[in-house]
Every structure is written in C-alpha cells, then in structure tokens.
Amino acid sequence: MAKEKFERSKPHVNVGTIGHVDHGKTTLTAALTRVCSEVWGGAAVAFDGIDNAPEEKERGITIATSHVEYDSPTRHYAHVDCPGHADYVKNMITGAAQMDGAILVCGATDGPMPQTREHILLSRQVGVPYIVVFLNKADLLAEDCGGVGTDEYNEMLELVEMELRELLDTYEFPGDDTPIIPGSALMALNGEDDNELGTSAVRKLVETLDEYIPEPERAIDQPFLMPIEDVFSISGRGTVVTGRVERGIVKVGEEIEIVGINATTKTTCTGVEMFRKLLDEGRAGENVGVLLRGTKRDEVERGQVLAKPGTITPHTVFQSEVYVLSKDEGGRHTPFFKGYRPQFYFRTTDVTGACELPEGVEMVMPGDNIQMTVTLIAPIAMEEGLRFAIREGGRTVGAGVVAKIIE
C-alpha cells in the first residue's frame, strides 16, 4: 500500500495530555481522535491502541509514549499521551515530545491530586507555554449532585475550578485566563452527548486549542543559531566552522557572534558551503560550513555556537529539572550526593559542573527526578528550555533541562 502523502497545508501544532493517574487522559485522547475524525475528517484511534503505548528510546532512556494525530478546521495536531507517571517525567525532561501546549485532564469528582500538581510544575520547569484544562467525569459529578445545572453541581464545579486556577497561578500560569472545559471523555468516546457534556465538550476543547494556543514559530523564522561541531583552517581563505543550523538563516555578509566557553566575540560570515558547493545562505536543518572573517583557528572551538548578535548569552549557573537514569537504563547503580561533579553535555560538548541539591535532600537515587542548581566551570550559550545530558566519562547517567538561568 502506498504511503499517504503528508499534507503540509495546515500549521502543525504539538500538544499532549497531562494530569493525575485515572483522571481520563487516555480516554480523552481517544475521544479527540473520534470526534475530530467524525467532524473534520481523519482517522479515529481506539482506547486500546493508545493505552498499550510502544516503548521508545530517547538518549538511552526508555519512554512509553503514544502518538496520535487529529485535525481541526485550521490545524493539524500531533498529540502525545503517556501510560505512566514516570513516562511523563522522562518525556517532558528529555523533550522527546516537545509540547506547544498541554491539555490538563482533571477529574471533576476528585479535583486536583498530587500528579495534577506535579505535571503543572513540570510544565513550568520544562517550558510548556500554554495549558488548557479539561474537567473530566462531569457526568459522574452530575449523578452525585442530582443532575447537571443543579445548585450543588454548579457549586462543586466552581470549587474544583477555583482550586485548579489557584494551582495554575502557583506555578506562574495565568489561572484566571486559563480555559476550563467541563465534560465527559467517556461519553464523547461512545458518541454520546447528554447535556452537551460528550461530543460537544470535546469539540469545544478542540476549538479552544485553536484559539488559545498560538501557532508556534517555525525554526526557520527564529533568530540564527548554529552549534559548532568542528573547526578547520583553509589556507588563503581563513577559518571554517561546521555544524547543523539549529534555527534561523545565516546569510553571507552578515555579522554573527561566537558565544560560549570564552568571551563573546563578533565576526562576519564571508561564505557558506554545503557539500563543497558555495551558497549565499545556510538554513535551519542544514549541515553547513561557515567561513569566518578574521577569526583565527584557535579562537573558536567545538561547544561554542554561532548566533545572530544579541540573541543568546553565555551562562554558568542555572536551576534545572533532571531525570537520573535507572540502573536498568544503563545509569548509575548507586545514588549521588551533594558536591557531585559530573559532565554536562550541551549540544556538542561536555562541561564539568557542580550540583547543589534542594534543601533537605541528601542524596539522589537512580530513577529519581529532581530540581538542582548547577554551576559550570565554563560558560555555555543557553536559554531556558535548553536540554542537556549528564555524563560520567562519556556514559550518559541523566537528562535535564534548563528551567531558570541564575547568572
């Protein structure tokens, strides 16, 4: 059977379901594919097809994730759902599935639970920019309160909503402005719609995603950045650095900065080549060589980045969210303690750093996730949301993300 051609006509947006165990994340994921396929076309995916998620490896870490897709009238959504809490932690920290927005599923009968809080915190730490709330199991709440629209039902909904908005505020999301949609994922999955809690609520959710989550900026439209992988000296022409353009475009004749490890310097791009052909620009996703005017071979090194001037700065101290690989994943067999000094691998290079653990935490076990403050021995070009690996002698023992830059 021939593969279907991928439609590039609609903007592509990455979302995912987060929330406490058994609040209905997977049911909602299945309901979204069903409702969208019936209303706007596409394929429905059954609950079982999402629930037994295949395991995949991201940087040596085993993560079970389900990927589904669905369409709204204006967009194509790629949606991730994870079976277990540990999978969410790993997924969000490694950036295996980066989200432009998250759908927080919270049971109306239970209200916010420990993982509800933890997933909101993780979203803040790893830089998920927007959250939309689906208040699930509203049909069960209605049964308990003598029906939809009764005073008791409205009061209970309002209470849970208030709790959720406060929780979102705590983690610096705009609680008051966050859309909260009550409904029943199970009803929608079964094609029912009593009191508009089923298919109507899920349709409303998709319309809300369309309105509330802005279209992500494409890599090519962002400011130029290229991690340096190699440096060559070409007699008579000067210094060439090679790497894969991470974002943006570099044009011949433009001024660029060399950032990281040493003091930031400015230079000019005097040539771009790819496969030994000269080009007038290098674009996001391309592996190129960039010729630098007046830069000596020993003034640039692997681990630095080329960037549009003023768009990225070098830092040494940052707060991070880290997942420590378990023994089974090839990680450490023993815990580590404060004063731990591994290598932090950013983009193309390792830099040694010292770890400061949160107050009251004495040790970190393999398989844990933890917030820690890192002080590097050399500055690295970084911004919040940058991913890194933690290594000991070339072996990966953890994965992390820059949550907040300190200096």
From Swiss-Prot:
Annotated Gene Ontology cellular component terms: cytosol
Keyword Hydrolase applies: yes
Domain tr-type G: 10-217
InterPro entries registered for this protein in UniProt: EF-Tu_GTP-bd, EF-Tu_GTPase, EFTu-like_2, EFTU_2, G_TR_CS, P-loop_NTPase, Small_GTP-bd, T_Tr_GTP-bd_dom
Annotated segments matching region G1: 19-26
Region (G3): 81-84
GO MF assignments: GTP binding; GTPase activity; guanosine tetraphosphate binding; translation elongation factor activity
Positions of region (G2): 60-64
HAMAP family: EF_Tu_B (MF_00118_B)
Protein name as catalogued: Elongation factor Tu
Organism: Teredinibacter turnerae (strain ATCC 39867 / T7901)
